[in-house]
């Protein structure tokens, strides 16, 4: 008995020592990890490229925010070593080489040669930076770039909007050129509407529909349900002073058709699309099927509004049906943003406004505001214990059901956020209409804004405006959100930095954490203007989780090489416009909510949207219970649903075939935390120590048992 108690005491002492040992190992690992990070950042800072310099710091009044913990302040460190010293303008984002890394599509116009060049820079995992990949040049001045799969082969192609550089008139005459990625990863021009016009070559089956250019930046979406991206444009002329048309994609080019001659639109009176415009393909009524939204000049109200065309099935056939009335935007509206800003599962609007002046090419000079305009429709049913009334709410098992909707009409001060009171104004002008960048910086489930500002002296600022609850209306359970200055990036006061023309959220290392890319211009020592960019990397983590989702465009991915001459190695370059995602998540208080996101919803005026949807899940220890994806098709079955998705993962949806959603598949890859390997090493060390101790104690116990057994046998005499 004494030996047993002695052994037990020794076991307890060893366990205490084991805990102390584990704590010391963990502490040392954390210290080494932090010190290495600080050294790396210091070295990178010392080796920075000094041509384009930006500083960053937290905004002071953040200290009084009750909702932000001291431990949760964002920390951004500038990184000059990720290959962003590129003398070209940013055009779009996409996965060019199908390695699940987002690449850069850039361009530059040479005034002397009258040529534009498209550059592809891919992110190299080996070198941990963006590296040059390929380029292509053509005659014309680029006005917009869209990276998208044009011929349905899974490889990322490039669609360019350009002006004739020999046209001295100030008319908005935009032509289109299509560049396909060939088997050698190079871009080849396969269609050019300007060349078709010069050669007097017909691009339509009906001579009335022969259209070579558009007067607005077009909307890109699949109109005729073949999975190929089409183009909706507008031209001056006709009895109304304008007419709409569509360039239908034929895989190796486009054919033009007048809007009125296409039988999928329930035709009614049209208004003129504005220039600039922020038209979109986005789910307005919550049925997981994207609708068409155009920013138009309402001829009756003499104001800019949203013209909405709902994607509906009528008597077994698909139509776009015009909504009964336009939604009139606030006066002096700029580029409209679409997203689930209050986290209730419906697409809301965020509209920046300002007073402009013709003296600075219609830039903002006063009264800069941000309007939050909620989309009021059926929410998710709040209880799973009783049968829900589906006329008042959506059950989690049927989130993709159509609902009546209404955008908030009475926009009081509760719905308005003031941008700045110290003389800063929203960036952009008539030549470069500026979009705010949208993303959830802290994965709390609410979309924040990245805004470029300027003062009267020309100095540029980039700020993160945090999305916070402003007021809750009890009568209709409506959360009103506001946007507040949260984090600031300031350009160098030196005169060499002449402009910051754009900024965007970007997940550089594909870890579910949004970093910042800032794009600008500077003057070299020999007085030449060059483009450049800098990256700010998030170097701290919150305890919030995320879900990243990407939908392909409907190409076959698995086992389709049997039907082709060769194996297709590129499948992730679709950059599909309009797929809709809906998820449900339960927070730490047990409250279930739904979220919605739309992939690549806009295409005009360089919106710089990422080729995926990043959901912030907040603090939750649960799975994503339901995950829906809907494709912008005209099929009866256009969406599918999966359950129990692991957080902190990237889901790739393979909607093949497009006409049968029951056969759609998903691929899931889990993104480990930054501390995953440290935790793994510490766990292995602890398990090894525990294993050794168990072995020692087991051997000792067997020795003690052997001695006791011998002592017990000595009391017996064998005769």
UniProtKB/Swiss-Prot annotation:
Organismal lineage: Eukaryota, Sar, Alveolata, Apicomplexa, Aconoidasida
Gene3D superfamilies linked to this entry: Integrin alpha, N-terminal (2.130.10.130)
Glycosylated residues in this chain: 144, 277, 410, 540, 659
Cytoplasmic side: 698-719
Signal peptide positions (record): 1-32
Membrane topology, as annotated: Single-pass type I membrane protein
Family the entry assigns: Belongs to the TIP family.
Name assigned to this protein: T-cell immunomodulatory protein homolog
Any one of the GO CC terms: plasma membrane
Organism (species): Plasmodium falciparum (isolate 3D7)
PANTHER family, per the entry: T-CELL IMMUNOMODULATORY PROTEIN, T-CELL IMMUNOMODULATORY PROTEIN HOMOLOG
Main location: membrane
Compartments where found: Membrane
Transmembrane segments: 678-697
């Amino acid at each position: 008995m004494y030996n047993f108690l002695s052994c037990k005491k020794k076991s307890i002492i060893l366990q205490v020592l084991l805990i102390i040992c584990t704590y010391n190992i963990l502490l040392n690992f954390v210290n080494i990890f932090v010190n290495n990070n600080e050294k790396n950042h210091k070295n990178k800072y010392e080796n920075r490229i000094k041509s384009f310099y930006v500083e960053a710091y937290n905004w002071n009044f953040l200290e009084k925010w009750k909702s932000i913990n001291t431990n949760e302040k964002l920390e951004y460190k500038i990184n000059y070593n990720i290959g962003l010293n590129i003398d070209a303008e940013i055009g779009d984002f996409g996965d060019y080489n199908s390695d699940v890394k987002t690449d850069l599509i850039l361009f530059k116009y040479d005034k002397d040669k009258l040529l534009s060049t498209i550059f592809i820079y891919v992110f190299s995992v080996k070198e941990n930076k963006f590296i040059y990949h390929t380029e292509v040049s053509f005659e014309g001045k680029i006005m917009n770039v869209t990276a998208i799969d044009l011929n349905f082969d899974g490889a990322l192609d490039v669609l360019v909007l350009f002006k004739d550089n020999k046209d001295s008139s100030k008319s908005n005459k935009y032509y289109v050129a299509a560049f396909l990625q060939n088997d050698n990863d190079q871009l080849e021009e396969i269609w050019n509407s300007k060349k078709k016009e010069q050669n007097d070559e017909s691009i339509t089956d009906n001579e009335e529909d022969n259209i070579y250019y558009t007067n607005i930046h077009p909307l890109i979406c699949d109109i005729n349900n073949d999975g190929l991206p089409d183009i909706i444009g507008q031209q001056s002329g006709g009895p109304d002073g304008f007419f709409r048309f569509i360039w239908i994609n034929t895989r190796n080019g486009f054919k033009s058709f007048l809007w009125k001659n296409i039988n999928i639109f329930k035709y009614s009176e049209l208004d003129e699309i504005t220039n600039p415009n922020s038209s979109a393909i986005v789910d307005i009524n919550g049925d997981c099927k994207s609708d068409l939204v155009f920013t138009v000049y309402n001829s009756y109200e003499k104001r800019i509004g949203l013209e909405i065309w709902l994607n509906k099935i009528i008597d077994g056939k698909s139509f776009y049906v015009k909504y009964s009335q336009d939604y009139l935007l606030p006066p002096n509206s700029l580029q409209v943003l679409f997203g689930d800003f209050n986290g209730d599962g419906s697409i809301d609007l965020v509209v920046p406004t300002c007073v402009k002046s013709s003296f600075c090419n219609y830039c903002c000079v006063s009264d800069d505001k941000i309007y939050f305009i909620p989309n009021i429709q059926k929410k998710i049913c709040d209880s799973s214990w009783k049968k829900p009334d589906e006329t008042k709410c959506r059950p989690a098992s049927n989130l993709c059901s159509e609902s009546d909707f209404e955008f908030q009409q009475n926009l009081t001060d509760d719905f308005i956020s003031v941008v700045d009171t110290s003389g800063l104004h929203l960036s952009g002008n008539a030549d470069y209409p500026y979009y705010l960048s949208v993303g959830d910086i802290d994965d709390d489930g609410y979309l924040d804004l990245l805004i470029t500002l300027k003062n009267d002296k020309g100095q540029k600022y980039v700020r993160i405006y945090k999305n916070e609850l402003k007021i809750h209306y009890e009568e209709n359970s409506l959360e009103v959100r506001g946007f507040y200055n949260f984090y600031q990036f300031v350009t160098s006061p030196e005169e060499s930095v002449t402009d910051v023309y754009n900024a965007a959220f970007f997940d550089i290392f594909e870890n579910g954490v949004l970093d910042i890319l800032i794009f600008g211009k500077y003057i070299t020592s020999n007085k030449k203007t060059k483009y450049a960019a800098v990256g700010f990397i998030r170097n701290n983590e919150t305890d919030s989780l995320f879900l990243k989702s990407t939908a392909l465009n409907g190409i076959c991915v698995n086992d389709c090489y049997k039907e082709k001459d060769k194996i297709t190695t590129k499948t992730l370059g679709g950059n599909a416009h309009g797929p809709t995602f809906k998820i449900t998540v339960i927070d730490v208080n047990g409250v279930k909510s739904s979220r919605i996101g739309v992939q690549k919803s806009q295409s005009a005026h360089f919106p710089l949207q990422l080729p995926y949807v990043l959901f912030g899940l907040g603090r939750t220890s649960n799975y994503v219970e339901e995950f829906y994806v809907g494709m912008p098709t005209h099929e009866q079955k256009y969406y599918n649903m999966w359950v129990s998705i692991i957080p902190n993962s990237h889901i790739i949806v393979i909607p093949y075939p497009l006409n049968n959603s029951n056969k759609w598949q998903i691929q899931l890859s889990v993104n480990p935390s930054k501390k995953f390997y440290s935790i793994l090493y510490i766990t292995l060390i602890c398990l090894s120590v525990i294993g050794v101790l168990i072995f020692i104690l087991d051997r000792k116990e067997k020795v003690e048992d052997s001695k006791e057994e011998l002592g017990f046998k000595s009391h017996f005499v064998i005769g």
